């Protein structure tokens, strides 16, 4: 596609002074990317997936775009429904001009320019031309999943993985001499804390028991099972844990009463709700944090979001479909207490807080 004389994306995009230009072009531009948090598919990277069209790359699973499209009033049919891939792309093209001043606008045009050589702004008038141009390039050998990462000099790519995952795609990538990217898992165990949702939690405990070979019947056996999965992930190159919580739990002391209630909760298959989920989460999370410290891992905490606000979409589409929101929780005292509990015992791992 033709290059416009006044490109929105150019070599000095966002560089607003000669100093900024020098710092970026001389020092930063050629540095490798070490991506320690993403939601990329390890299967796509391990198999070097080729995509049939740009909608499969851009729109399938990208709930940030889905959220923007819903905000603009696009019908769900053209977001997650049965519309064709081209129809969904054109719905996105219709939305993009209205994302101005949102990072989606910048990301969209950076990706079009850097990955596909497209200088045009994406809108309903240019949408079909952009769609066809991207698809022609995607049919070639230089626009596979790995080639995208290699183009941006990604040398270390972490994915987000549940403790019950078998990590076979990370192993596949490691054993593939043609894969130039270090593909590693991260340990994301939100489901292990969701004791407030008894039915889902108990199903997850069954899965964790099966994959760890430990029958989970009390707190000790739960922590043993989690330790085995930490060890397994570590043996597969993991050095990062990740947690999504509305708030960190209140500090409390582990007691035999907590263990007894957890035993009863498991044996009764959640017939009664757990009386103090915060106490349970605190004890499990503190125990895990000590495991991370022992292994030299980094722990990440995503705090403050209200997840899955729309129960209708949660039921029909599942979790993480673009209906989260910012919460109004209090964090400072809980965060201070949690970190201090670990630091007092010299077991505080390196920590990243979002």
List each model region and its residues:
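Metal-cofactor-binding active-site regions of metalloenzymes
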Residues: 2-295, 347-353
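Long, well-ordered mid-to-C-terminal structural blocks that present hydrophobic/aromatic surfaces
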Residues: 271-354
């Amino acid at each position: 596609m033709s290059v416009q004389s006044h490109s929105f994306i150019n070599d000095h995009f966002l560089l607003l002074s000669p100093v900024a230009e020098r710092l970026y072009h001389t020092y930063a531009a050629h540095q490798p990317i070490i991506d320690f948090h993403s939601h990329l598919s390890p299967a796509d990277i391990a198999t070097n997936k080729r995509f049939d069209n740009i909608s499969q790359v851009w729109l399938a699973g990208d709930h940030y775009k889905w959220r923007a499209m819903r905000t603009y009033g696009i019908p769900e049919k053209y977001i997650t429904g049965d519309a064709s891939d081209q129809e969904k792309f054109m719905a996105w093209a219709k939305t993009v001009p209205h994302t101005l001043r949102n990072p989606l606008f910048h990301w969209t045009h950076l990706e079009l320019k850097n990955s596909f050589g497209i200088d045009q702004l994406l809108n309903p008038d240019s949408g079909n031309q952009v769609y066809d141009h991207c698809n022609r390039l995607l049919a070639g050998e230089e626009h596979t999943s790995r080639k995208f990462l290699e183009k941006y000099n990604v040398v270390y790519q972490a994915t987000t993985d549940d403790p019950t995952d078998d990590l076979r795609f990370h192993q596949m990538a490691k054993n593939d001499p043609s894969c130039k990217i270090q593909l590693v898992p991260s340990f994301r165990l939100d489901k292990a804390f969701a004791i407030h949702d008894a039915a889902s939690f108990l199903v997850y405990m069954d899965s964790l028991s099966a994959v760890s070979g430990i029958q989970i019947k009390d707190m000790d056996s739960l922590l043993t099972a989690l330790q085995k999965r930490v060890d397994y992930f570590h043996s597969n190159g993991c050095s990062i844990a990740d947690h999504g919580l509305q708030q960190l739990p209140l500090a409390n002391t582990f007691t035999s009463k907590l263990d007894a209630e957890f035993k009863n909760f498991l044996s009764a298959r959640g017939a009664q709700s757990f009386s103090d989920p915060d106490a349970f989460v605190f004890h499990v999370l503190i125990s895990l944090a000590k495991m991370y410290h022992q292994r030299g891992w980094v722990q990440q905490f995503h705090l403050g979001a209200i997840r899955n606000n729309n129960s209708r979409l949660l039921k029909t589409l599942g979790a993480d479909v673009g209906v989260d929101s910012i919460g109004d929780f209090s964090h400072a005292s809980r965060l201070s207490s949690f970190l201090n509990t670990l630091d007092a015992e010299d077991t505080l791992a390196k920590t990243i807080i979002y």
